[in-house]
Design a protein with these regions (language model features):
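DNA-contacting surface of Y-family translesion DNA polymerases
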Residues: 165, 173-316, 388
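Short, charged/polar surface micro-motifs in flexible loops or helix N-caps
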Residues: 19-22, 278-281, 326-329
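Gly/Gly-Pro- and Ser/Thr-rich, intrinsically disordered tail segments characteristic of DNA damage-repair
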Residues: 1-213, 259, 343-392
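A glycine-rich phosphate-binding loop feature that marks nucleotide/adenosyl-phosphate handling sites
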Residues: 129-132, 212-213, 267-278, 316-327, ...
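Short, hydrophobic beta-strand segments
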Residues: 90-96, 284-287, 333-339
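Short small-residue beta-strand/loop micro-motif enriched in glycine and branched aliphatics
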Residues: 56, 281-285, 330-332
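C-terminal hydrophobic structural anchor segments
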Residues: 294, 304-358
Length: 392
């Protein structure tokens, strides 16, 4: 809320796109806008047809990041383990704090009220015995609410909801379920799992069937686990909507992180890709490698394959790569199917590039396909390294 402007939370409003050209998509919407049928992810032009008086303002990503850090700092002060789920969502694992905080509902109200009083915005808090139930509970009635969703409450609170409200269930899956006569989460939970898998695929069907029954054994992963490696990510001014755009950034990032890793004499056995969509949901996809590597080209090939597997060109504003499971071992398991000649050739290329950059600077040699992105990626990576060195 800015001085002289109405409170966007109390009027039909949305964040996203250019209000003058009416281009772009809705990143977030107010509760009054939701009553007009405005939905996150739809074109601004469509939202304006639903609600002609809709106030549309461009996103201030610097402000969002500042608010996010402040919000997460407060949350982290209460929990031994915190996992970021998106720019404005976290999971808190309160295991072992029962003597300090015996009443989880009372604690949730304390956290919620503190965020409102200190930061000026409201949050919903969901309480459950696993991440799924806590997330589902947080999406109940808004704003500024605390909700519980314990196993005994699933039949009354979760099962009556439409299947589209189930976490990670997309529009395509919703249409398949409705066509099969499955309209609520409860109907899905009572349906034979084999039939759900037949409709949605074996892996996806199993996961969503488990979710429909309130089961989720994924742990809350602390932020420290993510620091044992090399990573780079880039927030863009324009939406990333094609593989060509994404690969240009990812190749520049692979160049930077692989060079840092080689400088430290390390190799990685795991490569992951992370991206953030316009609704601020973040997704990650990773792959374990058969052999540890520090070769830029080999890493980039895996990154490309990962992105093909997990991304269908939804608009993005942030994308990144991470190299983990590090080793200093030079041993490499030989394979009959491996092109060892190409591996050695690429290692030599990386060595020459590293040497030139060390002697003359990073800007002296740049891949042609990354000329528009390499400088920005390198500058941000350097700033991240300096900040890490300062804090270590």
């Amino acid at each position: 809320m800015k001085e002289g402007l109405p409170d966007l939370r109390e009027i039909p409003s949305c964040i996203g796109g250019d209000p003058k050209s009416r281009r772009g998509i809705v990143v977030a919407k107010s509760i009054p806008a939701k009553k007009y049928g405005v939905t996150t992810g739809e074109p601004v032009s469509m939202a304006l047809r639903k609600c002609p008086e809709l106030i549309c303002v461009p996103g201030d990503f610097a402000l969002f990041e500042t608010c996010s850090r402040a919000f997460k700092k407060i949350c982290a002060s209460y929990a031994p383990v915190m996992e970021s789920f998106s720019i404005d969502e976290v999971f808190l694992d309160m295991s072992g704090t029962e003597k300090i905080y015996p009443d989880p509902v009372k604690l949730a109200h304390e956290i919620k009220d503190r965020i409102r009083e200190e930061l000026g915005f409201t949050v919903n808090i969901g309480i459950g015995t696993n991440k799924l139930l806590a997330k589902m509970a947080s999406d109940f009635e808004k704003p500024d609410k605390v909700h519980t969703l314990f196993p005994a409450e699933i039949p009354t609170k979760m099962w009556p909801l439409p299947v589209r409200d189930l976490l990670f269930l997309g529009k395509a899956s919703e249409q398949k379920l409705i066509k099969a006569g499955i309209k609520t989460i409860g109907e899905m939970a009572r349906y034979p799992e084999t039939e759900i898998q037949r409709l949605l695929g074996e892996k996806t069907g199993h996961q969503l069937y488990e979710y429909a029954n309130g089961r989720d054994d994924s742990p809350v992963r602390g932020e420290r686990e993510e620091a044992k490696g090399y990573s780079a990510e880039t927030t863009t001014e324009e939406d990333i909507v094609t593989y060509e755009q994404a690969f240009s950034l990812l190749l520049a990032q692979c160049d930077v992180v692989a060079a840092r890793m080689r400088k430290d004499g390390k190799k990685c056995s795991c490569v992951s890709v992370t991206y953030r969509m316009l609704d601020f949901r973040t997704r990650s996809h990773q792959k374990k490698l058969g052999n540890p590597t520090d070769v830029t080209e080999e890493i980039f090939v895996q990154v490309k394959n990962l992105l093909y597997e997990c991304w269908q060109c939804q608009p993005l504003r942030l994308i990144g790569v991470a190299l983990t499971d590090l080793t200093s071992d030079d041993f490499r398991q030989m394979s009959l199917f491996e092109n060892t000649e190409n591996h050695e050739k690429q290692k030599k290329v990386d060595g020459v590039v590293d040497d030139i950059r060390k002697r003359f600077g990073n800007g002296m040699i740049v891949r042609g396909s990354t000329m528009k992105t390499a400088d920005k990626v390198a500058r941000k990576a350097k700033a991240q390294m300096e900040l890490r060195d300062k804090n270590s």
